[in-house]
Amino acid sequence: MGWNGGLTSPSMEEHFYPFLIERRPSYMEEDEEEHEDEDLSLVLEKKDKDLLLAAELGKALLERNDQLMKAKDALEEELRETLETIEQEKHDMRLKMEVQESEWRAQVADLESDLAEARLQMQQLLSEQRECGRESASAAQELSEQNQRLVEQLAQASQVEQALNMELKSLREENRDLTISRGQFAPCLQSLRSENVLLLENKKEMESQTKQLQDENDNVQNQLISAKEGIFHLQRQKKDAELQVQQLQLEAQKLRDSQRTLQLQVKELQEELHMRDSQFSTHFSLHSEIQQSTAGQDHEMTTEAFPGLPCLPPSPYNLQKMGRNSVETQSITSDYMDTYLTEREGDLLRDSEEETIRLQDKVTMQHVELTTLQEEVQRLQDLLQQNNLDSIAKQAVLDRDEALMKKGELEQELARCQMEKESLNLQLLSTIQQKVMLSQELEAWQDDMQIVINQQLQSQKQQETQKVPETPQNSFMRRDSKQGRIFSFFKNI
């Protein structure tokens, strides 16, 4: 700044001398006139006037300069006061800024901790949201698959319905034909009904007869089993009897063999006796002893071969031969031996004949029983065949009843298919309702999450406003910074 406060001099400005500008053409004219007329007096007068005007102008300029100086001093004083006020306000603002900066740092630390917690909560919420999204996606996938299955089932049900409708149409046509033919064949139907009643009565009678025949068949089966057991027992007895006959035959053969052996021995003894006939009187005792020893040997051999036979005396036949050839003086003894031999042989023959007759009678009885049992078995077989014929007739009646029941069964099947179709439709509707409910729940969950986030942000804002009373400018700056942080946080997420 200069002496005049930085203001330019008024002498250098043309707008402070308007009269000079206005009179400049006149000066030029006067100069021309001076050159032309060379009127010096006029020039002098004009110069005097100019001097007067310059003096007046200088005086005005001095007054104007004084006013400007006063204005300058006032402005400098005002500027000084303003600068002092500004410096004081600047110092106060610096102190406030330091206090607010410390508060802001504390708030920033709190906000960072809150932001970390909010990030953790947001991560948890996002993980839960992803989990819910996966669950909702899986549920939607399951619902879509179930919907697809239901659509396929519905298509199948529609196909079945079409088939059943066609079948129902054919059945209705058949029913119509039957109703038409029923009017034509009403007498036949009445007769068939009467025949059916008779057949039902016969059926009941046949069922009762069948039941009786079954009972009889059971009894006959039991009798047949007992008869088979009796046949087996008789066959076993027959085998035992045959074995006994074979044993008796063997015993008889052994007796014949022993008899031949004894005959040979007797023959040898007879030869010896013929040779010693002359010495019979002297050796009679010896001959008797030999006979006794021979009879004892024969008896011992017979006992050893057949222990079951009764004890018999020495063979009368041998004694007879021996007595005939050796002792003529002992006629009484030989007669006694002949009588004993005859009686003994007769007893043996009678016993063998009785045993043979008994066995023959037993075999005959067994044969008769076997024949009776065979006849009974044949009768039972005939009865079973007759029962088979009755069962065939019964089966025919049952087939007719089954054919009559088919129509009702088909109608029941059609009604069941209709019910299944209705149930499938209801299931489809319930599935669609569940899908809509799940979508509504998902939207409600998203809205709840948004509300929770907004509530947390509002609570943080309320805490900040309660902690620090702020000016509008600072609150606006903080709001902008906070919104910038929130937006940057969501961008980072």
Swiss-Prot record:
Q: Which GO terms describe its biological process?
A: Golgi to secretory granule transport; vesicle transport along microtubule
InterPro entries listed in its UniProt record: Spindly/BICDR_Dynein_Adapter
Q: Does the keyword Chloroplast apply?
A: no
Instruction: Supply the alphabetized keyword list.
Output: Coiled coil
The terms describing its cellular component in GO are: cytoplasm
Q: Which residues form a coiled coil?
A: 56-275, 365-431
Keyword hit for Coiled coil: yes
Which family is this sequence assigned to? Belongs to the BICDR family.
Q: What is this protein called?
A: BICD family-like cargo adapter 2
**What is the gene name?**
bicdl2
